[in-house]
Amino acid sequence: MLQRFQELPTSEPPVRSHVARVLGSVALASSKAGQTERSRQEPRAALALDESIPEAYLVLGEYMFQGNDLAGALDTWEHGLRLNPENVALARRLERGRSEAQRLGGLERVTSEHFSIAFDGRADVPGARASLEVMEAAYRSVGALFELYPDGPIPVVLYPDRSYEQEGHVSWSAGVYDGKIRLPSAGANSTSLRFRGVLFHEYAHALFHRATGGKGGPAWVNEGYADVAKLVADPGPAVRCTPDVHSFQLRVLEQSFGRIGSHKQAHLAYLEARHAVEHLVDRHGQAGMKALFSELSTGAPFATAFERAFHEDYAAFATAFDAEAGR
């Protein structure tokens, strides 16, 4: 498509401007779909025709941001906003980027074959290197669960002066995955099973995002499968959720766990989500989970994707799962 646009006659300014706007819109769609290379090429092609296109600055800055080039992203958004001072999307994205820069302090990067880790170089070099080692192990082990091995570099951000103990469960505190794996760095130790388990869990979220084409799914599927991945690195004590301790209706766990009010309740929610996913894995295997992710990537409603992947009704599954608590 990009080549066809470039072949259009663009000597006339109105034509150039129109083609640039179309390319900007296409670039935005490519970025939302996770098409990394097109997210780099299309906005640059748009800006070559018309340097004022705001969508092109949004996408190009996001491409740099996801590559942990925070300074380049900020420069790109700032330039775009100077040319489009009334553009709300650019202003908001720039504000979020500046907030992240303040949290990270003196930004440095270390890279491996598959990951690029941004961190506060004044304090976090050992934590960054420990994280890099564990993430490469997760690439192999969690990748095997999803049968998914993305091309690198996959961006990771370590936040200084925050520990896993302070954060509780990282996913619960970190919020919605936005293309970067975000972790506190204090207590990073590549030999710690807990540390390894947290990173495996977080990498599973990144693969869930990619496996579903960015469409996502219910929180209990995302968090439950991530906890299955966590057990690969950190088996921990033999704690399994049993039906008598179900604390939530399964449909309640479709929404973000960030709404849950306490660490104890959050812990029970994660156990229950993992229990539900273990039911699915026991019945349908990893191939069934892969089929579910594939159906979700089409944008189908979850109940439809569930029925197509497992050939059973989601409402019936949820009702039976909830009924286990009363047995």
For the regions a protein language model found, what residue spans apply to each?
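Beta/coil-rich, acidic/histidine-enriched accessory regions frequently appended to metallopeptidases
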Residues: 1-4, 18, 22-45, 52, ...
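TPR/TPR-like (Sel1-like) alpha-helical repeat modules
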Residues: 3-6, 65, 70-89, 94-101, ...
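Helix-start (N-cap) detector for alpha-helical repeat units in TPR-like alpha-solenoids
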Residues: 13-16, 20, 54-55, 88, ...
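Juxtacatalytic substrate-recognition/specificity segment
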Residues: 106-218, 229-237, 246-259, 269, ...
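Active-site-proximal alpha-helical
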Residues: 142, 247-315, 326
